[in-house]
């Protein structure tokens, strides 16, 4: 068991849990659900963890990639970063950054017929040497339920981009154009405060929300921000109506220099429990650990009257109300 995090019970009261819910180095998490079980992998692609409730996680002991797939991925890049798992049709797809440098990195596709893999190598989706986009990393793949179009959002120091994929999600669509969606290039913003990475898209009440992380992932400058658009191919704007591609985004979650939990970012998925409460996963540093590890946290996400998401106090919580699943 990675973490047994429930801390309080009461007659008729909702249980609480302690953060981090994954108390080990687990950066850039992606989480998916199938038949009542949650699965997660993270940067490094070491193993698959499973959970019944997003709080209690167990190491399955299963490698996410087959031996052949891992060898082919290693040939593409020394480092495996920021996986993204999504179901397309009857296949489970895994998208992974294979990284050597900001000018030599790409996004590669893998597939499996079961949610826990093993995922087999399919091939390259896009690469910095093909597009000239520095840091072709941090894939986010999704299918628009209104049109059926499959999209890839990605990027970091070369700014965030989107491009259409073919219906199988295994190649860039014929004639597709790479479009700048969010953030500035690091050459124009060396502090990285408006350089965005870790894209995640979420649909709610007729809006598409684009969650991003800005700052330096290794320190307290890292923050989660958000903007929204009516369509996946439209302009994403912050709460004031300013364009995300001009470097604007509404602050969602941050830390202060003295905080025990600092540098929250690169959020994973949002899940809604049986009570209708939304929860988001993200990684964060824990000063009390005495390490530079990035642990995975879980926290309730709320929505205001104008449809904008927010966290309680805008800070990382040491404990929160536990979600309810599968009872």
Placement of each model-derived feature along the sequence:
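Bacterial N-terminal signal peptides
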Residues: 1-8
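Carbohydrate-active catalytic/glycan-binding domains of CAZyme proteins
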Residues: 11-327
């Amino acid at each position: 068991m990675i973490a047994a995090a429930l801390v309080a019970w009461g007659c008729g009261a909702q249980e609480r849990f302690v953060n981090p819910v994954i108390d080990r180095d687990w950066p850039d998490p992606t989480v998916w659900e199938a038949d009542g079980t949650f699965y997660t992998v993270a940067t490094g692609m070491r193993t698959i963890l499973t959970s019944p409730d997003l709080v209690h996680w167990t190491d399955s002991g299963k490698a996410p990639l087959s031996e052949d797939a891992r060898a082919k991925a290693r040939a593409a890049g020394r480092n495996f970063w920021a996986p993204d798992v999504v179901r397309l049709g009857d296949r489970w797809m895994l998208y992974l950054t294979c990284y050597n440098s900001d000018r030599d990195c790409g996004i590669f596709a893998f597939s499996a017929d079961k949610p826990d893999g093993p995922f087999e190598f399919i091939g390259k989706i896009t690469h910095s040497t093909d597009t000239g986009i520095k840091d072709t990393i941090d894939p986010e793949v999704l299918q628009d339920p209104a049109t059926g179009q499959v999209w890839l959002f990605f990027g970091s120091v070369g700014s965030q981009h989107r491009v259409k994929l073919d219906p199988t999600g295994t190649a860039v669509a014929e004639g597709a154009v790479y479009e700048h969606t969010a953030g500035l290039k690091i050459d124009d913003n060396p502090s990285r405060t408006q350089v965005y990475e870790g894209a995640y898209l979420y649909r709610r009440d007729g809006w598409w929300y684009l969650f991003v992380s800005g700052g330096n992932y290794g320190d307290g400058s890292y923050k989660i921000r958000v903007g929204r658009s009516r369509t996946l191919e439209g302009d994403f704007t912050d709460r004031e109506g300013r364009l995300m591609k001009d470097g604007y985004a509404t602050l969602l979650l941050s830390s202060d220099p003295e905080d025990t939990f600092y540098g929250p970012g690169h959020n994973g998925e949002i899940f809604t429990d049986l009570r209708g409460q939304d929860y988001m996963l993200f990684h964060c540093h824990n000063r009390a650990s005495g390490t530079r590890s990035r642990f995975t946290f879980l926290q309730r996400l709320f929505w205001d009257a104008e449809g904008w998401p927010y966290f309680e106090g805008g800070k990382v919580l040491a404990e929160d109300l536990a979600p309810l699943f599968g009872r």
